[in-house]
């Protein structure tokens, strides 16, 4: 179809595609590796005459198989072949109303997509729709919903169009518009049979996002970072092996099955190191200080690469958008008591980015306030800003050189910066000054034990939390209200 938003920008059939025997051998290797689910996609998988044979080979070996199609060739006969082969379901790409969908793809594409969904409905095959969202169609979601209900669609996946292939930057939605997608998906939860699904590129960690993910994703965490090369594998038409088919620049190709068995590629030392070895220390920008950085790891790597040319920071995040919307309001505040009150509440709710912003603002208004400096040092630490934590805590010690809490905070910051001897000295000074603080003494003994055992346990060290009586909450909507700051509450 040569779609205007296709991430592949394919013009003609590739000359180096795997042939049928190579594809079937690959199926055996995938099953042997313990793969549980395979999705056939493209391009357009139905352009291969052997697509059903590939699916059947996988199913025979206990692998669940589904497919993503544009629907043009997925007629009643193809649906029957998919069912006979054992496909669990099929997703059809549908990107708007007929006018918009055909403009993005080609005339007649909308009718073929709807016909494919109707054929699946009549045959009793599980169906899904995938909608790639951009400026062209973001406002069309409410108009699409009744049609999808009529076509018996069971799952509706919403994903971002990224500037790769034929997709141009001017049509990519703004980071602030991701919340529109999440809010719409959330509105579907109790409206009928269609299960909304957020693709991995849409997130992360706003309250609505967590509720949507929990409705279909069984896990302790709604999102725990990109799984490319960890539990996911991507295979290109020519047998190139990737962590994710969206991330396919030459430097991300781990090998080719025509030269190397899949198991060898997968288990090779150093394979997929760009993601397997990725850690919170590799983050930057907002993601570096985000409370969810250690588990989220910056969301979808492909979004970061296409939008920032780096894996460090992800602007397309609903939680980030909520927090950053508050920054101008905080910067306008001049009442130190209110800033401190909001900071304490934010710290109690582990919303460290907001606490840090409130305290930085308060510090510009009163730079010699010990309470502000102590809490700001703690907030910097929790935001993984260890040098800032050290600098601010040293300022606090200039005001109160015998303050045990500040010496403890300095010791933690120094340890994170790799200054182990200096960290231990600061901890000992804190212990000498904390004789009447049982909680702080307990924290200090634990941290000194970690320091003496070597730096392997430093990741478990934490400065003592400032005392607060405020309740904790994972509901960000109520949390923002409790703090007294929200996008709708100055």
Describe each PLM feature range:
Residues 348-349, 382, 416, 450-454:
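Register position in tetratricopeptide repeats
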Residues 1-88:
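Conserved alpha-helical substructure of the radical SAM core
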Residues 246-338:
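Flexible mid-to-C-terminal extensions adjoining Fe-S/redox cofactors in radical SAM and related proteins
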Residues 18, 84-85, 89, 93-95, ...:
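Radical SAM enzyme [4Fe-4S]-AdoMet core and its adjacent flexible, acidic
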């Amino acid at each position: 179809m040569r779609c205007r938003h296709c991430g592949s920008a394919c013009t003609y059939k590739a000359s180096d595609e795997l042939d049928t025997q190579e594809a079937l051998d690959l199926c055996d290797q995938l099953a042997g590796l313990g793969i549980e689910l395979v999705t056939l996609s493209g391009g357009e998988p139905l352009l291969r005459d052997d697509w059903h044979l590939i699916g059947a080979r996988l199913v025979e070996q206990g692998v669940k198989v589904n497919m993503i199609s544009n629907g043009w060739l997925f007629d009643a006969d193809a649906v029957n072949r998919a069912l006979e082969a054992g496909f669990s379901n099929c997703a059809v790409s549908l990107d708007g109303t007929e006018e918009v969908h055909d403009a993005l793809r080609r005339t007649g594409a909308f009718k073929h997509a709807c016909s494919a969904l109707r054929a699946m409905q009549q045959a009793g095959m599980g169906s899904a729709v995938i909608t790639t969202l951009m400026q062209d169609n973001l406002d069309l979601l409410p108009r699409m919903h009744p049609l999808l209900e009529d076509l018996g669609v069971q799952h509706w996946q919403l994903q971002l169009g990224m500037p790769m292939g034929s997709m141009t930057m001017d049509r990519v939605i703004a980071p602030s518009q991701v919340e529109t997608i999440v809010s719409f998906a959330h509105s579907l939860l109790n409206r009928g049979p269609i299960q909304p699904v957020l693709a991995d590129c849409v997130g992360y960690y706003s309250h609505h996002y967590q509720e949507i993910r929990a409705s279909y994703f069984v896990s302790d965490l709604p999102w725990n970072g990109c799984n490319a090369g960890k539990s996911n594998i991507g295979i290109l038409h020519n047998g190139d092996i990737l962590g994710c088919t969206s991330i396919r620049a030459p430097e991300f190709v781990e090998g080719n099955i025509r030269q190397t068995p899949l198991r060898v590629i997968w288990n090779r030392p150093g394979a997929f190191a760009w993601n397997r070895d990725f850690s919170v220390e590799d983050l930057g920008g907002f993601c570096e200080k985000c409370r969810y950085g250690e588990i989220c790891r910056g969301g979808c790597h492909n979004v970061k690469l296409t939008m920032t040319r780096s894996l460090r920071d992800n602007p397309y995040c609903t939680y980030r958008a909520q927090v950053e919307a508050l920054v101008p309001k905080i910067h306008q505040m001049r009442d130190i008591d209110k800033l401190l009150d909001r900071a304490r509440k934010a710290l109690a709710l582990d919303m460290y980015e907001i606490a840090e912003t409130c305290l930085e603002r308060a510090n510009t208004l009163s730079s010699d306030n010990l309470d502000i400096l102590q809490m700001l040092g703690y907030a910097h630490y929790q935001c993984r800003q260890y040098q800032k934590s050290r600098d601010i805590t040293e300022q606090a010690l200039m005001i109160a050189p015998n303050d045990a809490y500040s010496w403890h905070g300095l010791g933690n910051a120094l340890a994170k910066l790799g200054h182990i001897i200096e960290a231990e000295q600061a901890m000992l000074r804190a212990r000498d000054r904390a004789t009447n603080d049982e909680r702080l003494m307990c924290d200090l003994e634990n941290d000194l034990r970690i320091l003496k055992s070597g730096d392997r346990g430093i990741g478990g060290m934490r400065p003592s939390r400032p005392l607060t009586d405020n309740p904790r909450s994972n509901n960000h909507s109520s949390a923002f209200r409790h703090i007294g700051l929200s996008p709708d509450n100055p």
